[in-house]
Amino acid sequence: KEYSYYFQECYPIAISRQRFIDEQVAYKNPSLGYLCLAELISKNKIKNIWTTNFDSLVETATNIIDPQKDMLVCSSANSTSIPNFNPQHPCICKLHGDFRYDTLQNTDEELQALEKAIYEYWKQSMMGRGLVVVGYSGNDNSIMNFIEDNIDDPAFLSKGLYWTVIRDGNVSQRVENLILKAREKGKIAEIVETDGFDDLLYD
């Protein structure tokens, strides 16, 4: 809530918000965690990544580790092409937009709902699979509503939901309620303490 509020206050015009994000994330180098993640992608250990970040660090890291690896990038800019995606290729889906192409979602109003095509693609991709949540607090409705709306489906996240949090940190009541509801539906659901993104992926 604070994030979206101050974003709106400082940059009330959408194009100004997009330019600010562009300045912050363009030409950044991936950290150790991203390089480790890229190695897992290269070895086909991780198939899909769903991110609220606007940057291209995952793509950059993957290109460093495995320049020959084909990776699909999904955002609102190309969501009409989702039916043509080759499921054999790993995919990174920018849930709030890609700073290079999209109208970004970062104010409270913009964070209320996912684009329909992306919503359906994510939903189908989570059938018979699990989800590890890293570096996300659960403070925007679009993502939380998506998980909450589908958690009753036995096939959705049937391999479990693992919500990571910095050691000795806290999760919101909404996240705790989601974990409890997932367990009630017979799913494996855990809050996992970590020492941060880089340490988690390196370990």
Q: Where are the regions that the model predicts?
A:
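Short beta-strand/turn micro-motifs composed of small residues
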Residues: 51, 96, 165-167
